Amino acid sequence: MKKILFSFLVAGLLSACGGNESSTKTEAPKTADITKDPAYQKGVELEAKNDCKTCHTIDDKLTGPPFRDIANKYAGYPDTIVAHLASKVISGGSGVWGQIQMTPHQGLSQDDAEAIVRYILLLKNK
């Protein structure tokens, strides 16, 4: 019985001694609100003016892949991917996401297509 009490006493003393650790917790940095990013705002504006929502949503597959899947696939790629993907938006095509062809958007400027791509890439999972 004395051994059990002694064991509890030692365990209590050891747990009370916290060492030199700070008692304040460091909070993890908060994830930035992407809706405040100018690239997000411009992308939403351009998406509304074009036919993107006919085939895409942020999270659900329609005719085309969800924007979040696109963002996750290209996360970590160099910035040069923006111009490449924008040219794919303008020219259309198939093969990357299956055999259903994305319609060309030849009336879209390279700058606007790049703005839409930047918006999409912001939607990646954190």
Region locations from a protein language model:
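Gly/Gly-Pro-rich "capping" loops immediately C-terminal to redox-active cysteine motifs
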Residues: T57-K88
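Sec-exported extracytoplasmic/periplasmic mature domains
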Residues: A48, N72-A75, D79, I90-S94, ...
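Axial heme c-ligation environment in periplasmic c-type cytochrome domains
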Residues: P65-A71, I90-V117
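Bacterial signal peptide processing site
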Residues: C17-E21
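Positively charged n-region of N-terminal signal peptides that target proteins for export
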Residues: M1-I4
